[in-house]
Design a protein with these regions (language model features):
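Residue-level signature of mid-helix packing/kink "hotspots" within the transmembrane helices
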Residues: 26, 54-58, 62, 147, ...
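Helix-breaking motifs and short loop linkers at transmembrane-helix boundaries and internal kinks
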Residues: 40, 72, 93-98, 238
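Extracytoplasmic gate region of multi-pass secondary transporters
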Residues: 28-29, 206-249
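Juxtamembrane intracellular "pre-TM" segments in multi-pass secondary transporters
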Residues: 1-5, 187-211
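Cytoplasmic helix-loop-helix junction between adjacent transmembrane helices
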Residues: 104-140
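Conserved MFS/SLC helix-loop-helix module at the cytosolic interface between two early adjacent transmembrane helices
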Residues: 59-95
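Helix-loop-helix hairpin linking two adjacent transmembrane segments in secondary transporters
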Residues: 99, 137-184
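Paired small-residue
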Residues: 87, 98-106
Length: 279
């Protein structure tokens, strides 16, 4: 026990949240070919759908910090998981472009919040010696969440529609949310409000700006691969849709293996020394 919360339970909740982030990153790209076929979308309409995912993620990434500091981690983690699940259900049931766009913004918003929120939560409950390896282990669950969608769609799409498969995944996600609800989380760090002046002062940190610059391109490349790979395979090559999903799974598997490798490396090597080799 620690200050009224159980560290392992909180870490488990963070891992569930990271699984949801993995789902949010990969779902649209996995079902996009099926949506295009189902709704007979034009190229412009397809692009308009994909554009709304990073918009939601950017918004979520910007707002999570002040809210978590003021109201605590639980105030964001559980609602964000619900938002992602609701957006997923929107992809199943909505056939209107505006409603689909709202669903995709929701998936992105919840995912963007969960990405930062879960990392911050694990950082707060971890000691300095275990922080790097714990955050890397958390990242493995991003891979598990992201692997599940294209894998299940690729395997089961010959027997079930993508709507049925997503409904089954939604039930599992709902169980994860119900698990997180009764867990006690750490108290808010800034219960009196967010120090705006200190936050703006971070913009002067050159190392932070450099890492943000690197992450900008990395996340952009990852987003393009996640959202457009299956459509590209279907339109430009002769690769069947289910095999395109398997190809997408391979990329996510590579990310997951890298996260597992980080767990070992960060126990022996400083993260700053690993970064140049990753680039």
């Amino acid at each position: 026990m620690n200050s009224g919360y159980h560290k392992n339970l909180v870490f488990t909740a963070a891992c569930i949240g990271m699984c949801f982030f993995g789902v949010s990153m990969i779902t649209l790209g996995s079902v996009l070919p099926s949506l295009v076929t189902k709704l007979e979308l034009s190229g412009l309409q397809t692009t308009s759908l994909v554009t709304f995912l990073p918009i939601g993620m950017l918004a979520g990434s910007l707002i999570f910090g002040p809210i978590a500091d003021r109201f605590g981690h639980k105030a964001l983690l559980v609602p964000s998981c619900i938002i992602v699940l609701s957006g997923l259900e929107g992809l199943i049931f909505f056939e209107s472009i505006p409603l689909l766009q709202i669903s995709i913004v929701g998936i992105g918003l919840g995912g963007g919040i969960l990405n930062g929120e879960t990392n911050a939560l694990v950082s707060d409950i971890s000691g300095e010696s275990e922080k790097g390896s714990r955050i890397s282990f958390l990242g493995v669950f991003y891979g598990l969440g992201a692997l599940g969608i294209p894998s299940l769609l690729g395997i089961l799409s010959e027997h079930y529609s993508f709507e049925t498969i997503l409904q089954g995944i939604g039930i599992i996600m709902l169980a994860g949310i119900l698990f997180c609800i009764p867990i006690r989380f750490p108290a808010p760090k800034q219960a009196q409000g967010f120090p705006v002046k200190e936050g703006l002062g971070l913009l002067k940190e050159s190392s932070l700006l450099l890492l943000s610059f690197i992450l900008f391109f990395q996340s952009g490349i990852e987003g393009v691969c996640n959202n457009w790979s299956t459509s590209y395979f279907g339109q430009v090559t002769d690769i069947p849709a289910n095999q395109g999903l398997i190809a997408l799974t391979c990329m996510v598997a590579g990310l997951t293996v890298a996260r597992m490798l980080q767990i070992v490396l960060f126990k022996k090597i400083q993260p700053a020394k690993v970064l140049p080799y990753s680039l």
